[in-house]
UniProtKB/Swiss-Prot annotation:
Membrane-spanning ranges: none
Protein name in the entry: D-inositol 3-phosphate glycosyltransferase
Function according to Swiss-Prot or TrEMBL: Catalyzes the transfer of a N-acetyl-glucosamine moiety to 1D-myo-inositol 3-phosphate to produce 1D-myo-inositol 2-acetamido-2-deoxy-glucopyranoside 3-phosphate in the mycothiol biosynthesis pathway.
Organism: Segniliparus rotundus (strain ATCC BAA-972 / CDC 1076 / CIP 108378 / DSM 44985 / JCM 13578)
Taxonomic lineage: Bacteria, Bacillati, Actinomycetota, Actinomycetes, Mycobacteriales
Keywords from the UniProt entry: Glycosyltransferase, Magnesium, Metal-binding, Transferase
Length: 449
C-alpha cells in the first residue's frame, strides 16, 4: 500500500487477519527470569514536564509503568539523551528506577527530526553502560518510539536479548490524517518503523485500532502484537470540588470553561478548537477557553494562538497557561466544564482519560485510540470531523445541557476507573514473558478495544 511519505509497504487485510493477543490483568508478581529491563527513550526524558518540547503522553506512560514495574520487583534502567551539561550521568528518580542521561551530540540545538544523526552516538553510550559490567545484566530491552527502536534493534543483535517495542505514534497513520500546514513524516521514519515491526520480538499496541494499523500499514504479524491499554493515576486524577479548583486557579466561578491540554502543535488541533470556540463565545457570553501547554516543533505557538484570538475578537475570553505538573493539571480538569481533544492522531489519548477520571466530560476527535479512551455519548462525545463548525455545534450543545454534562462526568469517572497503571504493568509483564519465552501469548480479554 502506498501512502503519504512516498513509501510502499505490503499490507494485509486486517479483517481477515488473526487478531493480536489482547492482554488483561495477571497476578501481580514478576517472573524469576525477568530481573532487569532496559527502557530506551532517546528523544525525551520520562521525567520531563509533559506539554513542553517533545514531552507528552509517552513520558507519562514510561514514568508510570517504570514506577509500577519497580514496585513489582523488576529493576528498570531508563536510557535517555542528555540535554544539559547539568544532567547527572545517572540518578534514581524513584526506588528501583535508574535514569541514565547519555551524552549524544550537543546538549542544545538539535530538533527531534535531527536526532537520527545521533543514533550511533546514543547506541555507543548505552552499550558502554551495559557492557562495562561483568555480564549483560538486562533480561530484555523495551524501546519507545522509532528512534529508540533503532537503538534497541542494534542492542538486541549485539547482545542477544529480546526486544519489545512500543511505537506510541506511527508515521503512516500521521500522514494519512495530516493536519493542514503540518509536515509529513519522512521516508526514513517510515522505513525505520517497518524494520522494527519485522525485527522486534514483541510489539505493544495501545488499542486494537493501533494493532490494526500495524498490520494494515506495516504488514505486522498479529501473533506478536500485544494490546496493552495505558492507564491513569487514579490517586492523582480523581473528582473534586469544582468551585474550590476554580478558586485555587483564579478562574471566574460564573463562566463556563472549555479546556485544552497538550502541546501547541498542528497535530493536537488547538487552532481548530479556537476557531470553533470563537463562534461559541460570540453566541454565548460567559464562556472561556483555557489552553494549557507549550510550543512543540514548528507551525503553532502560544503567541500565535493569542494573535489569532485577537484577530477573531475573542482574546479576552482566551487564557493561555504553560504546561502544568500533575497536581495542578488535576485542578485544571476539575475546574473545567468540558475538555476538548481535537487531535488529528492519537494512539490513545491520556488527556481524555485523565479528564474523565476527574469527572469532566470530553469532546474528542473520532480518531486512533480516542474511541477507546472516551465512551461516546456516555462519558463524552466523539466528533468525526475537524471542521470547526462541527466542533462548535457539539461544544455549544454540551454547554447548553448542564444536566447532561453532570451525567457524563459521573459516567467518565466509572469509565476511567477501568484503566490503571497497575493493569498496564500487568500487560507489559505478560508481553515481556512472551518475549523471553520466544512465543505468543494466549489470547486474553482486552480491557477494551
Amino acid at each position: 500500500m502506498a501512502y503519504p511519505g512516498g513509501m510502499a509497504i505490503p499490507c494485509q487485510d486486517t479483517a481477515a487477519a488473526p487478531r493480536p493477543a489482547a492482554v488483561s490483568a495477571l497476578p501481580a508478581r514478576s517472573s524469576p527470569y525477568l530481573r532487569r529491563v532496559a527502557v530506551l527513550s532517546l528523544h525525551t526524558s520520562p521525567w520531563a514536564q509533559p506539554g513542553t518540547g517533545d514531552a507528552g503522553g509517552m513520558n507519562v506512560y514510561i514514568r508510570n509503568t517504570s514506577t509500577v514495574l519497580a514496585r513489582r520487583g523488576v529493576a528498570v534502567e531508563i536510557f535517555t539523551r542528555a540535554t544539559s551539561s547539568d544532567d547527572p550521568p545517572s540518578w534514581e528518580p524513584v526506588p528501583g528506577v535508574t535514569l541514565h542521561n547519555v551524552v549524544a551530540g550537543p546538549f542544545e540545538g538539535l530538533r527531534k527530526e535531527e536526532l537520527p544523526s545521533q543514533l550511533c552516538a546514543f547506541t555507543a553510550g548505552v552499550l558502554r553502560e551495559c557492557v562495562g559490567h561483568e555480564a549483560w545484566r538486562h533480561s530484555l530491552v523495551h524501546s519507545h518510539y522509532w528512534l529508540s527502536g533503532q537503538v534497541g534493534w542494534l542492542i538486541k543483535d549485539r547482545l542477544g536479548v529480546p526486544l519489545v517495542h512500543t511505537a506510541h505514534t506511527l508515521a503512516a497513520v500521521k500522514n494519512v490524517t495530516l493536519a493542514e500546514g503540518d509536515v509529513p513524516e519522512p521516508l526514513q521514519r517510515l522505513v525505520g518503523e517497518g524494520q522494527l515491526v519485522a525485527e522486534s520480538d514483541r510489539m505493544v499496541a495501545n488499542t486494537q485500532v493501533e494493532a490494526g494499523h500495524l498490520t494494515q500499514y506495516y504488514a505486522a504479524d498479529p501473533q506478536k502484537i500485544d494490546v496493552v491499554p495505558p492507564g491513569v493515576d487514579l490517586g492523582m486524577f480523581r473528582p473534586g470540588d469544582k468551585a474550590a479548583a476554580r478558586a485555587e486557579l483564579g478562574l471566574d466561578p460564573s463562566e463556563q470553561v472549555v479546556a485544552f491540554v497538550g502541546r501547541i502543535q498542528p497535530l493536537k488541533g488547538p487552532d481548530i478548537l479556537l476557531a470553533a470556540m470563537a463562534e461559541v463565545m460570540r453566541a454565548k457570553p460567559g464562556v472561556r477557553l483555557l489552553v494549557v501547554g507549550e510550543a512543540s516543533g514548528s507551525g503553532l505557538s502560544p503567541e500565535g494562538i493569542m494573535a489569532t484570538a485577537e484577530r477573531l475578537g475573542v482574546a479576552d475570553n482566551v487564557t493561555m497557561w504553560p504546561a502544568q505538573p500533575p497536581a495542578q493539571l488535576a485542578k485544571v480538569y476539575r475546574a473545567a466544564d468540558l475538555v476538548a481533544v481535537p487531535s488529528h492522531s492519537e494512539s490513545f489519548g491520556l488527556v481524555a482519560i485523565e479528564a474523565q477520571a476527574c469527572g469532566t466530560p470530553v469532546v474528542a476527535a473520532k480518531v486512533g485510540g480516542l474511541p477507546v479512551a472516551v465512551a461516546d455519548q456516555v462519558s463524552g462525545v466523539l466528533v468525526d470531523s475537524w471542521a470547526p463548525e462541527r466542533w462548535q455545534a457539539e461544544i455549544a450543545s454540551l454547554l447548553a445541557a448542564p444536566e447532561r454534562l453532570r451525567a457524563m462526568g459521573r459516567a467518565g469517572v466509572a469509565h476511567a476507573g477501568r484503566f490503571s497503571w497497575e493493569a498496564t504493568a500487568d500487560g507489559l509483564l505478560a508481553s515481556y514473558r512472551a518475549a523471553l519465552r520466544g512465543g505468543a501469548l494466549a489470547p486474553m480479554r482486552a480491557v477494551r478495544g
